[in-house]
Amino acid sequence: YVITGADDVFALSVDTGAILWQYAAKLDPGLTSICCGWTSRGVGLGDGKIFAGMLDGRIVALGARTGKELWSVQAERWQEGFSLTCAPLYYDGMVITGFSGAEIGVRGRVKAFDADDGKLLWTFYTIPGPGERGHDSWPQDNEVWMHGGATVWHTPAVDPELGLIYFSTGNPGPDFNGAVRAGDNLFSASIVALEARTGKYRWHFQEVHHDIWDYDAPNPVVLFDAEIDGRVRKGLAQVGKTGWAYILDRETGKPLIGIDERPVPQEPRQATAATQPYPKGDAIVPQHVEIAPEGYELVNQGRIFTPFVGDKGVIASPSLYGGANWPPSSYDPVRRFLFVCASDVAGNFIGGDRDFTIPPDGQHYEGGVVGFAPLPRTGIFAAVDVRTNTLAWRYRWPDQCYSGSLATAGGLVFVGRNDGRLTALDSDSGLKLWEFHTGAGMNAPTTTFERDGKQYVVALSAGNLLIGSAR
């Protein structure tokens, strides 16, 4: 099953590639308020149905064999800034999804619907309201929390044994203006666990307090079991734009590998947090700038968490375009390796204004701007050993890494390149074994399946406008 960036859904024959059926999304023709490109990150499958999220805020259920629309619900209104870009999760008769739109001033949420008829079952707000856990991490003298972001870009993961779902959240809003939202701004830039049946909060871990850099957590969480410190632990890993892997106990939310709170540089006009979490182990991407670009002066050596304010740009690395972004990571349960596609991209940050006003619904709500620093922008593909949070290997590419990866039991890991190459690497060493040029940007994750005793690899290549890959 394939879904396009415009939400048309196709069923293809695994034997011939022929189209068996197709569903036209018929998006609202007035649709305008989309952040970060027309895209869909897949469909959900369960109970003989395909579940697809639409950019205009609908969820539709289709017959898996026929493509016939079985039900459709308006889960959120695009006119208010919401869109649906993740693949819905089917679990135990429910369809569970998050929503995009933090850059357009929405209040993040996750919803569960009945898979039979689309009836709403529960809602969890990722920005807590008055009287809810975490509301005190937002200002009490304004209503900025109502537009606080923390949207959920990717499909939640589920542990059926524990009955929990897990997801990571986006930036607080406005993105680059901390002056109007003093506090840690929960549950933005966080990993959150909920009870799947009820949506009840279980635990959270915040990766970035009071984020002013758009260092959110768009990469989907990965669940794993591994021996750490002499016993098998139920683990969870998430790789942020910070360039770190955050490795937690998925039962409790506590770090499995140490994470220290360290003091960071301060800028009172941005109400910056006093400390930030620093995971022990290796960063996947550089977190400082070696040499200032011509015509620029570096503040704090351009290190991660360097604050900024006003119209004079401040260079810091990584930027919101660096670290790990939307393309999903993959996990090898034999080697205990997490394979991560990331980018080494520094940014030039501008923002922070106490007089910032909330724009009307559906308009961009960022409170600043970040451009590319005049430095090389390169890609990194790496293997992280989840038992130690250290790099097993890492390779740098001349172009940004923007592709989901696939780990296989045969000791191969597959990843795409922006110029259209599908690359097979040795899982142990990262050495390239073979490549195939697909003709368009290989940005979607590769899929594998077995048919008649033979294993196949399927690659969807179409390019990506946001990253500027071949189309």
Give names to the regions the model predicted.
Residues 9-10, 59, 110, 191, ...:
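Structural signal for beta-propeller blades
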Residues 62, 66, 108-120, 181-199, ...:
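Beta-propeller blade signature
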Residues 47-48, 92-94, 161-163, 233-234, ...:
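Short coil/turn segments that connect the beta-strands within blades of beta-propeller domains
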Residues 444-471:
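Blade-level signature of beta-propeller repeat domains, shared across WD40, Kelch, NHL, RCC1
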Residues 19-44, 69-87, 104, 125-157, ...:
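Extracytoplasmic beta-rich repeat domains
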Residues 6, 56, 106-109, 187-188, ...:
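A detector of repeated loop/turn-to-beta-strand junctions in beta-rich toroidal repeat architectures
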Residues 225, 342-344, 373-431:
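Loop/turn-rich, solvent-exposed surfaces of beta-rich toroidal or solenoidal domains
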Residues 2, 52, 96-97, 167, ...:
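Residue position within the beta-strands of beta-propeller blades
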